[in-house]
Amino acid sequence: MYSSMASSIRGSTVHLSDRVHSKDELQALNTRLAKYIDKIRNLENENVALQRQLQTAEQTTVTEIHRVSKNYDEELAKLRKQLEDVLRDNARLQMERNSTESENKQLQQRVAQLEKQVRTLEARLRQAEDLVADLQHRLSQSLDVRQQLESDNKDLKNQINSLKGQIQQLKQDYDNERVRTADLENKLQTKEEEHEFEKNALHENLREEKSQRQYLLHDLQRGLQDEFESKLVQQLNELRAEYDEMIKGVRAEVEAKSESRIRDLMAMADQQGDTVTRLQQELEEWRKRSQTTEAELDRLRKENANLNAQLTEIQRQKDDQIRALQQQIRKRQEELQRINDDLGDLTRQYQDLLYVKLALDAELATYNKLLSGEEQRLGMDGSGTVIRRPTGGATGTGSGIYGGTGSGGYSRDIGSTTTTKTTYTSRPTYNYTPIATTPIGGTSTTGRYTPVGGQTLAARQPSPGGSLGRERDIPVLREQKITETFKASGRVGPRTDW
């Protein structure tokens, strides 16, 4: 009997040491859990910082686009002012033309008077013939100038055709850009749907946060794309209209002026040499102005190409920044998912260890009750003194949650020196089922964990970021009090009073 008691005490000591060891393991797991919680909070803070950087990049992009648009409007205003100056010069030249025509009429009247005087001035006939020869020579020069103007007109037409080809190429590039944009939008929508499908299996709080971020990025891309396309189409239409009006005006003006000047020169060649010379100078001036206008058109085309290149570069930089921020967000989400998985594994390990602890507590309580039952059955107090009782038999039956059964006895014959010791026929066996710990408190919104006392651990701490308003449920388990009733069944032999 004493050996069985000693073995029971040694078993209790071993279980106590195991319990201390499990307690240390639980403390280590709690420390790891706190570290994971801190890491999650830091990652959420970094996520908030990345969102702020994304907003800053968007504001910078919008500011740059407004600046380029403002510069383009200023250049457009300058060009319109120059066009008004050209139109003003055209009106002035028209007035000069009218004045020249009036002078021409006066000269014709004077020529008529001179013809009347020719009959009386036969001495000046040879001089007049020389003057006519000179005028014919100048007329040939005027014809050469006309041919030069016609060649210049052909060159201008070729340049106009080239400009139309460039406009057509710009239209084709614009259509290709729209097709590529539509393809990218379709790919982006496909990726968003895949991301939405994967996101539905995650935690409720992460799903809401991802959906808000996805909607924000989608609205941002669609808004910037629509704004870019509308501005590009409007600018191309305005530039095309201005170029067409300018080219038509210059072409009509050059053709009208050249033809009118040539007719005037041919009519006045026999009348006035000085007038022909002045008209030739005016034609030369008009040719120079045509060259100046052509140079101005070239400069405008170059400025348009530079503005288009700047817009393309700004759009490319914006797309690169958005892709970089999206990649960082995906990395943070993957890291959060990995940490959540580790947290789930750690929680399961914590629960398993807690189950083992409860099982050890139940087994220790069972052994304590067995020991106290043996002491009561043997009639011993806490100090091991045997209490004398009248000889007799005692039987007892019982049942409990452990289902233990056993029989045995101890007898002593008073009238002889022989002591008979009867051992148990079978050692009592005890079966137990560990009672699982259940979270105490209200129901969690996530469906996985239940907060303690109706309030989560994250709710009792300040949420990171301050503006997200997100809370995370942390599994906190509370041990339930285990109540058990121990009843032993067995048969005791006759007792002997010492």
Curated annotation (Swiss-Prot):
<feature type="region of interest" description="Coil 2">
    <location>
        <begin position="232"/>
        <end position="371"/>
    </location>
</feature>
<dbReference type="GO" id="GO:0006998">
    <property type="term" value="P:nuclear envelope organization"/>
</dbReference>
<comment type="function">
    <text>Intermediate filament (IF) protein that forms both short filaments and extensive cytoskeletal networks which most likely are homomeric. Some of the cytotardin arrays display cage-like perinuclear structures, while others are located in the periphery close to the cell membrane. The entire tardigrade body is ensheathed by a grid of belt-like filaments formed by the cytotardin protein, which retain their integrity even in contracted specimens.</text>
</comment>
<keyword id="KW-0403">Intermediate filament</keyword>
<dbReference type="GO" id="GO:0007097">
    <property type="term" value="P:nuclear migration"/>
</dbReference>
<dbReference type="InterPro" id="IPR039008">
    <property type="entry name" value="IF_rod_dom"/>
</dbReference>
<dbReference type="Pfam" id="PF00038">
    <property type="entry name" value="Filament"/>
</dbReference>
<dbReference type="GO" id="GO:0005200">
    <property type="term" value="F:structural constituent of cytoskeleton"/>
</dbReference>
<feature type="compositionally biased region" description="Gly residues">
    <location>
        <begin position="393"/>
        <end position="409"/>
    </location>
</feature>
<dbReference type="GO" id="GO:0005652">
    <property type="term" value="C:nuclear lamina"/>
</dbReference>
<dbReference type="GO" id="GO:0051664">
    <property type="term" value="P:nuclear pore localization"/>
</dbReference>
<dbReference type="GO" id="GO:0090435">
    <property type="term" value="P:protein localization to nuclear envelope"/>
</dbReference>
<keyword id="KW-0346">Stress response</keyword>
<dbReference type="GO" id="GO:0005882">
    <property type="term" value="C:intermediate filament"/>
</dbReference>
<feature type="region of interest" description="Coil 1A">
    <location>
        <begin position="18"/>
        <end position="58"/>
    </location>
</feature>
<feature type="region of interest" description="Disordered">
    <location>
        <begin position="381"/>
        <end position="425"/>
    </location>
</feature>
<dbReference type="GO" id="GO:0031507">
    <property type="term" value="P:heterochromatin formation"/>
</dbReference>
<dbReference type="GO" id="GO:0005635">
    <property type="term" value="C:nuclear envelope"/>
</dbReference>
<keyword id="KW-0963">Cytoplasm</keyword>
<feature type="region of interest" description="Coil 1B">
    <location>
        <begin position="70"/>
        <end position="213"/>
    </location>
</feature>
<comment type="similarity">
    <text>Belongs to the intermediate filament family.</text>
</comment>
<feature type="domain" description="IF rod">
    <location>
        <begin position="22"/>
        <end position="378"/>
    </location>
</feature>
<dbReference type="GO" id="GO:0005938">
    <property type="term" value="C:cell cortex"/>
</dbReference>
<feature type="region of interest" description="Linker 1">
    <location>
        <begin position="59"/>
        <end position="69"/>
    </location>
</feature>
<keyword id="KW-0175">Coiled coil</keyword>
<protein>
    <recommendedName>
        <fullName>Cytotardin</fullName>
    </recommendedName>
</protein>
<feature type="region of interest" description="Linker 2">
    <location>
        <begin position="214"/>
        <end position="231"/>
    </location>
</feature>
